[in-house]
A protein has these predicted regions:
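Bacterial N-terminal signal peptides that target proteins for export
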Residues: 1-8
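C-terminal motif of bacterial Sec signal peptides marking the signal peptidase cleavage site
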Residues: 15-19
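Bacterial Sec-exported substrate-binding components of ABC uptake systems
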Residues: 20-105, 212-241
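A short, structured surface patch at a secondary-structure boundary
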Residues: 54-57, 62-153, 159-165
Length: 291
């Protein structure tokens, strides 16, 4: 009788242990918004009831993208990845990140996490003081089309932050082959400066610092709105032409881009109002000179 009682107790403990650690889930479970952007339109973060893991969705992450959606699942607390998930998987909070754009570094710097950056593209063109101080240990993996994958692999990244210009990054295939997760950052496609800035919250999510990212964004938004509210001087608005020519061509941003909104909020006037698409357009030097 005593042996039977002990066996029953053991079985009960086993069932309890198994029940507490059964963390399997389905992708459809991740439908609860844990962060809904206020200014940005290119990403969202969802969770599931009783789960610490999150699902990051990035939409149309390059110019001209139409109905393109990419996913990153961040697995936390030993929780399993949904069996029906086919996107990128970050198996833990990111500690080693490779940034293919300097703006990615700025996002991490805004939450004091630029120490996570172990690799960059074009270190000589990066002004971040911490990166320059660590340039002997931060790897310069090169540029798209000429990536040093041997160096990239040696940096043991948890995640690579990519961007696309007019299509998917050429690094995708090789990163998949090397089993290195990646995520697109489409901040430059936002239509407002605060929308662009809000991507820092997503960068913070990668490090499990969502609250810190949201607090930082609120401070930035408050300061931005205060500056925007300053009365404009009683003078004509200065005309502004962004960028510089490249091979006798001037690329004019969309009048709906964050850059043009920034110029207007600062009291300037964009000289090229013909482009209301979602991409930059090429203008020859003669036309640019006449603007």
């Amino acid at each position: 009788m005593k042996a039977l009682k002990n066996l029953s107790l053991i079985l009960l403990l086993v069932l309890t242990f198994t029940g507490c650690h059964d963390k399997s889930s389905k992708l459809a479970d991740f439908n609860r918004a844990v962060y809904t952007p206020e200014y940005a339109s290119g990403f969202d973060i969802k969770g599931a009831d009783g789960k610490k893991s999150v699902l990051v969705t990035v939409t149309n992450p390059w110019q001209g993208a139409d109905s393109i959606t990419t996913y990153l699942f961040i697995a936390r607390d030993g929780e399993s990845v949904p069996e029906d998930f086919t996107g990128q998987v970050l198996g833990k909070d990111a500690e080693h990140i490779i940034c293919m754009s300097s703006t990615h570094i700025a996002m991490l710097d805004a939450i004091d996490e630029d120490r996570c950056v172990v690799g960059v593209s074009g270190i000589d063109y990066i002004s971040n003081p911490d990166i320059q101080a660590r340039r002997d240990s931060v790897g310069d993996v090169g540029y798209e089309g000429n990536i040093n994958y041997e160096l990239l692999l040696s940096l043991d990244p948890d995640l690579v932050l990519l961007y696309g210009v007019n299509g998917a990054s050429s690094m995708e295939g090789k990163l998949k082959e090397l089993n290195i997760p990646f995520m697109y950052v489409g901040d430059y496609l936002e239509e407002s400066p605060l929308g662009k800035a809000e991507w820092l919250v997503l960068a913070a999510e990668l490090c499990d610092l969502r609250a810190a990212g949201a607090d930082t964004l609120q401070r930035i938004a408050r300061d931005y709105q205060a500056l925007k509210a300053h009365p404009a001087p009683d003078a004509p608005r200065p005309k502004v032409m962004p960028n510089t020519p490249y091979r006798d061509t001037w690329f004019m941003p969309s009048s709906r881009s964050f850059m043009i909104r920034l110029i207007e909020d600062a009291g300037g006037e964009y000289v090229y109002t013909k482009n209301d698409s979602d991409t930059s357009v090429a203008v020859d030097l003669e036309e640019a000179y006449l603007l």
